[in-house]
């Protein structure tokens, strides 16, 4: 669908674009569209992520690695030692959040165990997460906590745990990421990482307007990194 929307924007002769990449950890399929916008001197700004080989383009992003580090460090400081992780494999946010997970484990003297990590794709998130939770908690060495890619996954994990007669947070601690409305609507009070969505949008809009007013907009790549907090 990204190619369809990019074509629509191209046909409408827009003056600038804010783009949230899809499957950003994979090689981009629509480089020809981005090149076409550049040839037309139309600036674009990536938000939330970027594509491989396009790291030099203007972008506004959250420090996903730092955010997940904070979540896992929080669990470790609460005495959790068997911390599972669930991450999305086909976007750059998932890859960087996994890096933060690994770094926090190491920082707290906890060995990384790949058997405690569940990976999912956009298309199979519920299937993979359900299977992963059942496998993790069906073993004799159950995790004492789960750090999730985002709040949506965390709420799904809580549902699966409840179906297995495991209470959150009494039996298992679960953390999310995004501080979305789902965090407050979860059965358990979900600890989550605040995602500054409004700030991201403001910075992206300001950046694209500044680029529109420049003489050479596509020659001026820059990045704005927004911090997170528990």
Language-model segments: what does each one mean?
Residues 1-73, 138:
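Alpha-helical recognition/docking segments in bacterial nutrient-uptake
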Residues 69-110, 220-230:
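An alpha-beta-alpha
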Residues 1, 21, 116-126:
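Short beta->alpha junction loops
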Residues 130-230:
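Flexible loop/turn connectors
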Residues 14-24, 45, 84-87, 118, ...:
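Periplasmic-binding protein-like
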Residues 64, 94, 150-151:
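Helix N-cap/beta->alpha junction signal
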Residues 82, 112-116, 168-173:
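Short acidic capping loops at alpha-helix termini that bridge into adjacent secondary structure
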Residues 58-85, 99, 103, 126-135, ...:
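Hydrophobic alpha-helical segments within soluble ligand-binding/sensing domains
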């Amino acid at each position: 669908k990204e190619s369809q929307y990019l074509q629509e924007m191209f046909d409408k002769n827009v003056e600038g674009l804010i783009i949230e990449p899809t499957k950003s950890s994979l090689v981009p399929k629509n480089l020809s569209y981005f090149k076409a916008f550049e040839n037309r001197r139309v600036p674009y700004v990536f938000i939330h992520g970027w594509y491989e080989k396009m790291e030099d383009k203007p972008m506004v992003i959250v420090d996903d690695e730092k955010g997940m580090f904070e979540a896992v460090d929080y669990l470790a400081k609460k005495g959790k030692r068997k911390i599972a992780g669930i991450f999305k494999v086909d976007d750059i946010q998932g890859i960087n959040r996994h890096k933060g997970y690994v770094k926090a484990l190491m920082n707290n003297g906890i060995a990384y165990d790949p058997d405690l990590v569940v990976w999912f794709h956009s298309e199979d998130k519920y299937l993979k997460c359900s299977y992963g939770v059942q496998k993790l908690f069906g073993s004799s060495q159950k995790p004492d906590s789960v750090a999730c890619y985002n709040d949506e996954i965390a709420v799904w994990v809580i549902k699966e745990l409840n179906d297995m007669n495991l209470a959150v947070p009494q039996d298992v601690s679960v953390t999310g990421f995004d501080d979305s409305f789902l965090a407050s609507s979860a059965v358990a009070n979900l600890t989550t990482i605040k995602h500054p969505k409004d700030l991201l949008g403001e910075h992206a809009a300001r950046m694209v307007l500044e680029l529109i007013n420049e003489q050479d907009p596509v020659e001026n790549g820059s990045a704005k990194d927004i911090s997170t907090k528990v």
